[in-house]
Amino acid sequence: GDFQELKDIEGLQVSAVSADLYKNGRDDLTLFYFPEGSNHAVAYTKSSIVSESINWNRKNAKNNIKALVVNTKNANTFTGDQGLVGLDDIARTLLESLKKIENENGYEKTKIKDIIFASTGVIGEKFPVEKIKNNISYLVSNLRINQNKLIWLKVASAIMTTDTRPKLAYSEIKLGDKIVRIAGIAKGSGMIAPNLATMFSFIFTDADIS
């Protein structure tokens, strides 16, 4: 189609699935996994009303992460303890599911603080913890090391809410003897104001950034 070609990013694995959050079969749950760990930087909304997912990230995440879990349909906002405790439950389920591939490949084991979340959608509804947990093992077993345009379209579509089409971009540049790749996906339809609001933008690169 009219989307540019995208390539894989070294050190990143991705997968997406329908957790039936929309009850129509569309993909709505995504996992980004960094087997060797990854530095990350983040800009959150400045609103005083934030998702429990943001509260989790602020409390747990350090500079280095190993997994990002993104769900749509439910913003995990105004969910209180149910939403926050639910994230812990999901994180522990993910840790258990990752054990096999980490043991098989000699990866350092993921810890709770290595996992961050992003949630978008309706506010004030109970966070669908069980639906998400029930699809974690599928996400892990279907992680893709090689990401072509179709894979990137799949994950870009999985983070959408009211968007009319997925948003994604890719570029690469030669630095010395190395080709550095940068890929990005985003969601948001009139949602960037105020202060990022409910917009998501995820940018991945294999550049050596500390």
Give the ranges of each region predicted by the language model.
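Non-cleavable N-terminal signal-anchor transmembrane helices
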Residues: 1-5, 87, 99
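N-terminal amphipathic/basic leader segments beginning at the initiator methionine
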Residues: 1-45
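Basic, gly/Ser/Thr/Pro-rich low-complexity segments located predominantly at protein N termini
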Residues: 6, 16, 78, 85, ...
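Glycine-centered structural positions embedded in regular secondary structure
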Residues: 11-14, 67, 184
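Short, basic and Ser/Thr-rich N-terminal targeting/leader segments
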Residues: 25-27, 50, 153, 167
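Glycine-rich phosphate/pyrophosphate-binding loop regions near the starts of catalytic domains
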Residues: 32-89, 116-118, 191-210
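Glycine-rich, mobile lid/loop segments that gate access to catalytic sites or pores
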Residues: 93-104, 109-210
